[in-house]
Regions:
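Active-site beta-strand termini and strand-to-loop segments that position acidic
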Residues: 52-57, 168-170, 332-334
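Active-site metal-binding core of divalent-cation-utilizing nuclease and nuclease-like domains
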Residues: 6, 11, 15, 19, ...
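A conserved beta-strand-loop-helix scaffold within acyl/acetyltransferase catalytic domains
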Residues: 128-232, 238, 248-250, 258, ...
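Acidic, metal-coordinating catalytic cores used for nucleic-acid/nucleotide bond scission
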Residues: 19, 44-46, 67-81, 107-111, ...
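Short hydrophobic/aromatic beta-strand or adjacent loop that forms the aromatic wall/cage
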Residues: 49, 162-164, 324-329
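Conserved active-site alpha-helix within GNAT-family acetyltransferase domains
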Residues: 251-285
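Basic, glycine-rich
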Residues: 1-11, 15-22, 88-143
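Short beta-strand-loop-alpha-helix junction that forms the active-site gateway
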Residues: 43-86, 182-187, 200
Length: 343
């Protein structure tokens, strides 16, 4: 396969057909190289469609090209999709107990993101090296030091945070898993902290296979709660009584959230706050686009709101909706959240 730094939209339906088949071949190769059984073009009783489906491991994959997954403009022969359609698909998958992974073309054609995407399929199908948390230790360091780790092992890369909790192999000292924490953006001051991002090694000792750290999440969670008894997210003296945690619905179903308290360290509760659809913006190949954006899919950018709105109107910027995020919160027992949000 050939990786692409910038995406170009097809100019006619024949180009689109060739493009779509190419994207599907990339995903198909992952299944076949790992000897994972699959069916193609499956429609379930509730209307959910999957380009690929593995019944044994309850895994569905949808290949999302931009031309047929745009909500702001009619492209070629495709009608605009609804802003909530990917979110609705995610709900349908959950109803069936299926994990739906969305294969966006910019990600499976990206040299770094492709391998993280591949690992998602492998992991769901039980293809991983098992490591036990008892053979690891937790190290607390500034979050920025883990940026290379996230760039290699998380499909979204690194996100700004304050403190990293790193699970390391006791013998080799190599980092295996990490959670970072920082100020909570959700709730505008109602919550003390958020898990900014998590990641696990996706290419253990250059085997092309990632790892599962048995009891790793609960071990990291235990240390975060201990740390939060006397510290703020940035390490200054304080206390963390509430922690927000996000699930990216484009790839995950959130089932692991219920196991965060398995360590039994401290009582408290984990609740689901909200599940909201999302979207990103595809900056088409036009002259007025900034060079850093042309041919790329970007997150929301409030500073460019006027330019983006204009781009929607003239069709030079496309809205690509997605399944969004589910937001959870942990609250220590006996704690009442602040009633008034702070700015």
């Amino acid at each position: 396969m050939t990786f692409e730094e910038r995406i170009k939209l097809p100019t006619n339906m024949e180009e689109w057909k060739i493009r779509k088949q190419y994207l599907k071949s990339i995903v198909r190769d992952i299944f076949e190289e790992n000897k994972i059984e699959y069916k193609e073009n499956v429609t379930f009783n509730n209307g959910l469609f999957a380009d690929f489906y593995n019944e044994q491991h309850c895994l569905a994959v949808e290949v999302c090209d931009f031309a047929s997954h745009c909500s702001s403009k009619k492209i070629l022969d495709f009608e605009r999709i609804g802003d909530k359609q990917p979110y609705t698909n995610w709900q349908k998958a959950n109803e069936l107990g299926i994990r739906l992974i969305c294969a966006y073309e910019n990600e499976i054609l990206d040299q770094k993101k492709y391998f993280v995407f591949k690992n998602m399929i492998q992991y769901q199908c039980g293809i991983f090296h098992r490591v036990f948390a008892r053979n690891t230790k937790v190290e607390i360091i500034p979050a920025l030091k883990m940026k290379p780790f996230y760039e290699a092992n998380n499909i979204q890369g690194y996100r700004n945070a304050k403190t990293a909790f790193v699970l390391k192999d006791k013998k080799t000292e190599e980092p295996l898993m990490c959670y970072t924490i920082g100020a909570a953006y959700f709730g505008k001051g109602m919550y003390d902290c958020e898990i900014a991002r998590g990641a696990c090694v996706i290419n253990y000792h250059n085997t092309g296979i990632g790892i599962q750290v048995v009891a790793g999440a609960s071990k990291l969670w235990k240390h975060i709660l201990e740390y939060g008894e006397t510290h703020n997210p940035d390490g200054t003296p304080g206390r963390i009584n509430s922690i927000v945690y996000y699930t990216d619905n484009r790839y995950y179903d959130g089932r692991s959230i219920g196991h965060l308290m398995d360590s039994g360290f401290e009582s408290g509760k984990v609740e689901t706050l909200a599940t909201t659809p999302g979207f990103m913006n595809f900056w088409d190949n036009i002259e007025e686009n900034p060079e850093t954006h042309r041919g790329k899919l970007k997150n929301r950018e409030p500073a460019r709101h006027t330019l983006i709105t204009q781009g929607y109107r003239n069709g030079n910027i496309l809205c690509i909706p997605n399944a969004g995020t589910t937001t959870h919160v942990y609250i220590r027992d006996g704690i009442e959240l602040r009633n008034e949000k702070t700015n």
